[in-house]
Amino acid sequence: SLWVWIFAFFLYDFCYYWMHRLHHEVKVLWATHVVHHHGEEFNLSTALRQTSTGFLWKWIFYLPIFIVGIPPEVFVTVAGINLVYQFWVHTEHIPKLGWYEYVFVSPSNHRIHHAQNKHYVDANYGGVFIFWDRLFGTYKEELDELKPIYGTAKPLRSWNPFKANLDIFAEMIKDSTRTKSIKNKIKVWFSRPNWRPDDVKVSHPIYKNDLDNFEPYNPSTSFEVKIYSWIQLFFIMGLSAAVTASVTSQSFQDTSIFAITLLITSTIALMSMEKYELSFLPEILRSSAVILSLIHI
């Protein structure tokens, strides 16, 4: 019935709020979400910046939806609507929307969610409805006198997708290994994201952004590397379109080969943009992957 759909829509967003909030408050969860916040620009592409490890924990938070008997097709539909809604709020070009800000997630209150300013952090977790944040005390309003600075307090300073997805996991492993306290070896994983053992903070300090002198990550790149990267981008777009168009007729092995080729190509192209010149060995690896995929076709 219509009431089932309405109930499911609200329940999904309620579960999303708590899933999202805890992914900002528990480090092992934050490790699977941080990729979405690494971006130091705020635009629609930020919405597409998604982690590869989110599947590890997120499903747990939606179990109540199935426990109360919501049909799978209803769950998938409301989840899709919720996800699509979140796309448009990743923009700086839409100002505050008056009464809308009191009920729904908007570009203004979502800009705060992505800001690393001390006044703004840990706020506005809703997916569609912002009243969850107002109800549970996590709402913060965008101030005219304080422009949001986007990104994470501990900057990634890289376009390497492997580093982005594994950076916090690596930090937790190192900190839990280095600290002398048995208690802290466990606490590292379940603490707040900014917490580190005192002995490790002293022996292995981590650089944090100076927001008074903040500059987004934008390494200088030679003209040749830019041309190379554009060529790789067009190749990636073409192969992605071809794979998508024929995915129903592909075997799992075929799809896996194409996916690995795209992953290697895009990663090497991104890493090349961080240097003035191409690296010989990665380019050999990329070319080999392309040749093998073409032979397989």
Question: What do the PLM-derived regions correspond to, one by one?
Answer:
Residues 241-248:
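Juxtamembrane "helix-exit" motif on the non-cytosolic side of transmembrane helices
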